[in-house]
Design a protein with these regions (language model features):
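Alpha-helix capping/termination and helix-coil
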Residues: 35, 65, 77-84, 106
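Active-site nucleophile elbow and catalytic-triad environment of alpha/beta-hydrolase enzymes
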Residues: 57, 75-98
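Long, compositionally biased charged/polar accessory segments in the mid-to-C-terminal portions
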Residues: 69-71, 75
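Short, conserved loop/helix-junction motifs that constitute active-site signature segments
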Residues: 99-103, 127-130
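Alpha/beta-hydrolase-fold enzymes
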Residues: 1-63
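Conserved alpha/beta-hydrolase "acid-adjacent" motif
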Residues: 91, 115-121
């Protein structure tokens, strides 16, 4: 959020006087380091004929958000940041109590290498859920684990896990 809010075009309250092109490029470059895991980069999966080196790969990420309105990106980030199911009068900030109130069966499937939603977070939540299973996606694709676009291995894992879960 900070890179968008630091843009000279930012006017506060989620509004921009104009699209902050440089801030969105920085946003994309920063996100490249968080969207995918260190293992992804070590394995060289970022390399292709179109991106023969890290600099070329990062240039692709720098332009990834060119067509996305900065206000939309900021709103999405703020929703994610505020996403606390216990932050309400019913649960009073008590996350274990809020989790225990969930009656649906829950299949927790974080990416094994996700830098945002870590397996450890779900491990801490699991004991508070009534009927849940933790099944990390064994992927080096970080936050993008399970994204079926161009990832047949993750797709197959997800399909089988959901098939077994639904019985």
């Amino acid at each position: 959020m900070a890179v968008l809010e630091a843009a000279p075009e930012y006017r506060g309250e989620g509004r921009f006087a104009a699209e902050p092109a440089l801030a969105k490029r920085a946003f994309g470059r920063i996100y490249a380091g968080w969207a995918l895991s260190q293992d992804f980069y070590r394995a060289g999966l970022h390399l292709s004929p179109e991106t023969p080196d890290l600099a070329a790969y990062l240039r692709v990420w720098e332009t990834r958000y060119d067509t996305k309105p900065a206000a939309d990106l900021l709103a999405q980030l703020r929703c994610w940041d505020a996403g606390d199911i216990s932050d309400n009068p019913l649960h009073g900030g008590d996350l274990p109590r809020a989790l225990a109130a969930i009656r649906a069966r829950v299949l927790l499937m974080p990416g094994a290498t996700d830098l945002y939603f870590r397996v450890a977070d779900n491990e801490a939540e699991l004991p508070h859920l009534r009927d849940a299973k933790l099944l990390p996606i064994p992927s080096i694709h970080g936050h993008r684990a399970g994204n079926p676009a161009g990832n047949a291995t993750d797709t197959a894992f997800l399909r089988e896990a959901v098939r077994l879960w639904l019985g």
